[in-house]
Amino acid sequence: MAISDQVPTGSDFHAKSTAAEVLSGFDLTGKTAIVTGGYSGLGLETVRALASKGAAVIVPVRTPAKAEAALADVKGNITMAAMDLADIASVRTFADDFNATHTQLDFLINNAGIMACQQARVGEGWESQFGVNHMGHFALAQSLMPLLERSQDTRVVALSSTGHKISDIRWDDLHYDAADYDKWQAYGQAKTANALFANALSRRLRATGGHAFSVHPGGIFTPLQRHLPKEEMIALGWLGDDGEPSELAKAGFKSPEQGASTTLWAATSGALNGKAGVYCEDCDIAIPTDLDSPTARFMGVNAHACDDESAERLWELSEKLLSSA
């Protein structure tokens, strides 16, 4: 796929649609889903919605006590299993256990992530946002690949964001070994990587009718902002001087229930059949960014996040990085 494939489907859903509305009429009994980050924010709402429709949902957890408390009131067939995206060995152990106990995987929702955190290293010295948001999920998909390839019509959804507009992949200095660390640029690189991952994976699932998509869920107040001081969120316009959501945020931000809707639309919509690898927002395929529009910063997808050659280059690079982990 390429930027020219970013053509909306004319979806009946929109920016304010909720997870429940998107899944209305679906019966997911007999389906199996993995949702990373499934015990807070968007992930929790994604788990809630899938389970309410009968899907068996497996939630990888880094902090079991927190996960148990968050999922306690969620009804349905939900299982927790230990995994830390910053620890590739734990990712492989989770996947090995899943492969040994399951014969299909219908939905892989790569929801977990970190944003604009202070400089840190994970894995084999990887910059943490690239390491957690991309490499951890890449390792998970690689370890689950035999099952993904055997499962008919599987869907993989990678949560990117409008943050991809901040930065392309920093091919010559992925981990800020040479340049000064920029937490927002690093976040942008990771979100571009999420989109390119879905692009490349979609080609690898084609033989069995599988699809992979990336999505921008929208602006939502979730634990993702935990690394940002209040002063920075005020400067960004997300909060007013009183520390409460600004008028801009009230008008443009979504609730977690609304934020989960695009993920679930990408996971289930028949309108996306044959359109693997596209980037979605507001429950439809996103249009290319209109650089002359006042909404260019917030809407649409940039060409660097839809480039096939970059997607394959990142896949090969990620395989090399993973081989040493």
Task: Give a label for each model feature.
Residues 179, 183, 245-248, 299-304:
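A short, mixed-charge helix-start or loop-turn motif at secondary-structure junctions
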Residues 2-240, 320-325:
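Rossmann-fold NAD(P)H-dependent dehydrogenase/reductase core
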Residues 9-11, 91, 190, 239-297, ...:
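C-terminal helical subdomain
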Residues 59, 83, 251, 303-306:
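Pocket-edge positions in alpha/beta enzyme catalytic cores
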Residues 302-325:
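C-terminal amphipathic/interface module of NAD(P)-dependent oxidoreductases
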Residues 56, 74, 294, 304-305:
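Short alpha-helix boundary/capping motifs
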